[in-house]
Amino acid sequence: MGGGMIVTLSGELGAGKTTLVRGILRGLGWTGPVKSPSYALVEHYLFSSLYFYHFDFYRFEDPDEWNSTGFAECFRPDSIAVIEWPERVAARLPWVDVAVRLKLAEPGRTLELSAATEAGETCLAQFAALIA
């Protein structure tokens, strides 16, 4: 993952979206606490010169709520944005590099990953190499 990336996380409540974000942050080297942004809408983390924004739009009722948040300013070359419940703001997102769908399945979960940009394809290739 690198600056300028947007990753969306879809799945029902309890599918593990926030848990996955915790794992991503740990993989990037974050050692502090990782909170769910369900009530705050966004939690942010700073890695030297890289910002990491974790959004949760579950509580958004109307996509127009986006206009009053200032969140558009978070999508920049020096940031990574990971978005839970992206379908609530899909029309407002500038692009999506990687889309992740989590599903509950016995005895755990399934994960579907898809890339929509060259940066997303590179990210998924690096991920595949890590788990191979």
Give a label for each model feature.
Residues 16:
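Conserved glycine(s) of the Walker
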